[in-house]
Curated annotation (Swiss-Prot):
This is Pup--protein ligase. The active site is at D57 (proton acceptor). The keyword Signal does not apply. Mg(2+) binds at E9, Y55, E63. Catalyzes the covalent attachment of the prokaryotic ubiquitin-like protein modifier Pup to the proteasomal substrate proteins, thereby targeting them for proteasomal degradation. This tagging system is termed pupylation. The ligation reaction involves the side-chain carboxylate of the C-terminal glutamate of Pup and the side-chain amino group of a substrate lysine. It catalyses: ATP + [prokaryotic ubiquitin-like protein]-L-glutamate + [protein]-L-lysine = ADP + phosphate + N(6)-([prokaryotic ubiquitin-like protein]-gamma-L-glutamyl)-[protein]-L-lysine. InterPro entries: Pup_ligase, Pup_ligase/deamidase. ATP binds at R53, T66, W419.
Length: 452
């Protein structure tokens, strides 16, 4: 597929820290956060003018689903726009708390685990063709996704009975199946529930739920871009070596607990390889593929960072990618902090630092303090992120949805939308079905908008 539709869904952790006596549950905090949303959308599940979806997920986790994007840099921009939208809700909620005499700060964390051991996710969506066997696609992808965490893990200090350890991935401990139709109960690597949000005869939506939420824009670019390249190779019929894992669930934990990425994991055919070996195999094939087929600047940037990350791990020179790869950035930050203050990895101050890295408030979050200090690389520009808060991607179906919502709100018309339907809730109940996510211009939608 030369042009692909991408989407990201991020769930956020929420807490409220008080200096006073009164405490709020996550449910109550979520109500404060979404009060403004409910006031104009009459629901805590809404679509926005930029084509995105914002809602409260299971367990009072705010979730932001990006609009459909047809390039990885666009997707990174719209994911960051989601952070800014939620930060705006946070600031408004804190103002309301102060007005009601409740002292305290609300924190939103773009991470994947809380102190109670609960996990919430970052779900990646890739549009793929309906032709071909989905099981074969999954067979090739699972070893890639299990080992991909060495490129794009968010890092985590994990407290174990044997002491604290630094893990590469936050999500690895919470994955229980390779392929399944569940998302919360068994948490598979790939979710097979067949909801394409497009023409089901032509398309299928690959739903990957194994990845960590990323603060780093460059890590996000590598996560999405490398997966896209592997999908392109599969679609083009490139012969990839059989890397089927004997036990993917055991392997994903073993990889996460091994910062050298050299520990051997068993393949179904009896061979033993490391996560580094697996990634080297996919990377070398991707380099050949792009050299043969040609690639744009995004593909070249992805391959450059992919190769440098593998080299940094292989040579134990993590500083090579300390500005670009989340788990490395955070590890270097924690190690410097520990050595400066003489702390063990199990120190509560280290746990606090670990969490602060993921705070999306730009004045409080450690990642954003590093960004302001020029200590991390970027993909986006502030202006583009700001515009993406209210402007949908202009080359996908999201443009139609965004324009419809914008006009309906301006005209104070009652409407209902989802990923494929645009409906005016008037006497005629006029509805347009938009099954092609690549289509950004549609006469039927123009007429519906003009009729308001």
């Amino acid at each position: 597929m030369d042009r692909r539709i991408f989407g990201l869904e991020n769930e956020y952790g929420v807490t409220c820290v008080f200096r006073g006596q009164r405490r709020l549950s996550p449910d109550e905090v979520a109500r404060y956060l979404f009060r403004r949303v409910v006031s104009w959308g009459r629901s805590s599940n809404v679509f926005l003018k930029n084509g995105a979806r914002l809602y409260l997920d299971v367990g009072s986790h705010p979730e932001y689903a990006t609009p459909e994007c047809d390039s990885v840099p666009d997707l990174v921009t719209h994911d960051k726009a989601g952070e800014r939208i939620l930060e705006g809700l946070l600031v408004e909620a804190e103002r309301r708390l102060r007005e009601e005499g409740i002292a305290g700060d609300i924190h939103l964390f773009k991470n994947n685990t809380d102190s109670a051991g609960n996990s919430y996710g970052c779900h990646e969506n890739y549009l793929v063709g309906r032709h071909g066997e989905f099981s074969k696609l999954a067979d090739v992808l699972v070893p890639f996704l299990v080992s991909r965490q060495i490129l794009c893990g968010a890092g985590k200090v994990l407290q174990t009975p044997r002491g604290a350890v630094y893990c590469i991935s936050q999500r690895a401990e919470h994955i229980w199946e390779s392929v399944s139709s569940a998302t919360t109960r068994s948490r598979p690597i790939i979710n097979t529930r067949d909801e394409p949000h497009a023409d089901a005869e032509r398309f299928r939506r690959l739903h990957v739920i194994v990845g960590d939420s990323n603060m780093s824009e460059t890590t996000m670019l590598l996560k999405l871009g490398s997966t896209d390249l592997v999908l392109r190779m599969i679609e083009a019929g490139v012969m990839l070596r059989d890397m089927t894992l004997e036990n993917p669930i055991r392997a994903i934990r073993e990889v996460s607990h091994d910062m050298t990425c050299q520990r051997k994991i068993k393949l179904a055919n009896g061979r033993e390889v490391s996560a580094l070996d697996i990634q080297r195999e996919y990377y070398s094939k991707a380099v050949e593929f792009v050299e043969r087929r040609g690639g744009d600047e995004v593909a070249k940037r992805v391959l450059d960072l992919w190769g440098r990350t593998l080299l940094a791990i292989e040579t134990d020179d993590l500083e090579l990618v300390a500005r670009e790869i989340d788990w490395v950035t955070k590890y270097v930050l924690i190690e410097r902090f520990r050595h400066k203050h003489g702390l063990s990895l199990a120190s509560p101050r280290v746990a606090e630092l670990d969490l602060k890295y993921h705070d999306i408030h730009r004045d409080r979050g450690l990642y954003y303090r590093m960004e302001r200090a020029g200590l991390v690389e970027r993909v986006t520009r502030d202006l583009d992120v700001f515009e993406a808060k209210s402007r949908p991607p202009q080359t996908t179906r999201a443009r139609l949805r965004g324009e419809f919502i914008k006009r309906a709100q301006e005209k104070r018309r009652d409407f209902t939308v989802d990923w494929v339907h645009l409906k005016l809730n008037d006497q005629a109940q006029r509805t347009v079905l938009c099954k092609d996510p690549f289509r950004s211009v549609d006469d039927r939608v123009d007429k519906l908008i003009a009729s308001m």
